[in-house]
């Protein structure tokens, strides 16, 4: 997927080596990026230890929030696919003890939601 897909809210797969380098300042020593997806400016990163959600804020994207969720804290997740009239897909992640989802991300109609679901299933099951 290209630049236009990213602007439209479609997630695209990123090079794990590039993300490893970009997030080197927050990764633990020996922690490896296993999969990464870009959604507009935000990142969904799966490492061998945790899920990292990168939320770039503001016009320039200089202000950045890094949300780290250890896999053992994820109690469940759901994926809602796009339909005929509702064109958005949605990913929700609950953490232990929470009634409401801790993470809710919307995607435009694309197939990458299935790839993200597969990675989540692999690390949480």
UniProtKB/Swiss-Prot annotation:
Q: Which Gene3D superfamilies match?
A: Bacterial Pleckstrin homology domain (2.30.29.50)
Q: Which cysteines are joined by disulfide bonds?
A: none
Domain of life according to the entry: Bacteria
Which InterPro entries would you find in this protein's record?
A: PHb, PHb_sf
PANTHER family per the UniProt record, alphabetical: BHLH DOMAIN-CONTAINING PROTEIN, HYPOTHETICAL CYTOSOLIC PROTEIN
This protein is called Uncharacterized protein YjqA
Q: Which organism is it from?
A: Bacillus subtilis (strain 168)
Gene encoding this chain? yjqA
């Amino acid at each position: 997927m290209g630049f236009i897909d990213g602007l439209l809210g479609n997630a695209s797969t990123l090079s794990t080596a590039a993300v490893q380098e970009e997030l080197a300042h927050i990764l633990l020593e020996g922690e490896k990026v296993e999969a990464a997806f870009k959604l507009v400016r935000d990142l969904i990163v799966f490492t061998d230890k945790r899920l990292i959600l990168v939320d770039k804020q503001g016009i320039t994207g200089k202000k950045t929030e890094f949300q780290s969720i250890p896999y053992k804290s994820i109690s469940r997740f759901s994926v809602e696919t796009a339909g005929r009239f509702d064109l958005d897909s949605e990913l929700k992640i609950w953490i232990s003890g929470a009634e409401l989802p801790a993470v809710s991300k919307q995607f435009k109609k694309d197939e990458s939601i299935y790839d993200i679901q597969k990675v989540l299933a692999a690390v949480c099951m």
